[in-house]
Structures are given as C-alpha cells and as structure tokens.
C-alpha cells in the first residue's frame, strides 16, 4: 500500500523516533509498504517518521544506482533500530534531496565512513562499518530518526535561499508527483 509522505512542517519529522520491540505489530507489512511508497516516489531511502510513525525503521533501495555503482545491484534493505556509533573518514560534499522536502536539492557535507548497529528484517543484529554512498544515504535517513533533516546541515545563507520553498510547504503547497501529507 502506498502511504502519504509527510512534508516539511509536520511535527513528526522533528521528533526523536523510538526503538521498537521485535513483536512490533505488522512489521513486515510496514516495511513492504515503506518500500512500495519509496519506490513510487522515486526515492532511494525512507524513514518511518516520513510516513508519520515516530519509530526507528528505515528502508533503502539503491538498485537504481547500480548502473553507476555496480555494488548496489539488487541492494534493498530494511534497518530496524539503527544507530550510528561513530563517524570517520573525510567529510565529503554531495547534493542531496529528500522526499519530505520536494523540489529542494542542496550540497551537504557528511563523513564518508560510519560505524552502525541495526537489526535486519529477520531481526538479526548487525554491527559494521559502512562507507561511501551507502554511508551518506544511511546518515540522511538516520537523521530523520533523530528529528533532523538535511537542511539542518546547511549554512545560514543556503537556508535563507530556500526560505520561500519551505514557506510554500508550510502553506500546504508542496509540488511533487507523489502523495503527500502537509500541515494544511
């Protein structure tokens, strides 16, 4: 089932998400719905707060990137209760967009290496270092679980330059090709 994506201004996007227990109701169905919603909106990642749920669940599907990055062929994973334990490597700037910020794309600096823990869809524990593009996508999505958005990493000048677009979203005027839930 395709779910509406919550757009900038929705309070759930600024709340810290909670870890869930292994018996969380309908978890597999939720994950399937998140993948379907994300794919319909042409996203590569989706965090549960973006569909209105303040829980620590993220889906990432990087198969679309596999022409340029062959290591992501058939890469499709769910991350349950993910946490970043440590960051490393160098800070790399790359343009990011977000399904909750339609029409906004800005360069964001992030570490290119992270140490993460999470449960997979089978509730198996993982503790690993991740680097490169996947590390960036994870940081972007995991930010949502901490009540942050990529615009929080921008300079005051860049924030000022997108103020009009953010204001339009607050008025319920998000322009995109997928189903959204605005505050108006």
UniProtKB/Swiss-Prot annotation:
Similarity comment text for this entry: Belongs to the polypeptide deformylase family.
Name of the protein in question: Peptide deformylase
Residue positions of the active site: 141
Enzyme category, top tier: hydrolase
Pfam families, sorted: Pep_deformylase (PF01327)
Cofactor annotation: Fe(2+)
Gene: def
Binding positions (Fe cation): 98, 140, 144
Coiled coil feature spans: none
Reactions catalysed according to its record: N-terminal N-formyl-L-methionyl-[peptide] + H2O = N-terminal L-methionyl-[peptide] + formate
Stored HAMAP family: Pep_deformylase (MF_00163)
Species the sequence originates in: Phocaeicola vulgatus (strain ATCC 8482 / DSM 1447 / JCM 5826 / CCUG 4940 / NBRC 14291 / NCTC 11154) (Bacteroides vulgatus)
CDD domains linked: Pep_deformylase
Cofactor: binding comment: Binds 1 Fe(2+) ion.
Superkingdom as given in the UniProt entry: Bacteria
Keywords: Hydrolase, Iron, Metal-binding, Protein biosynthesis
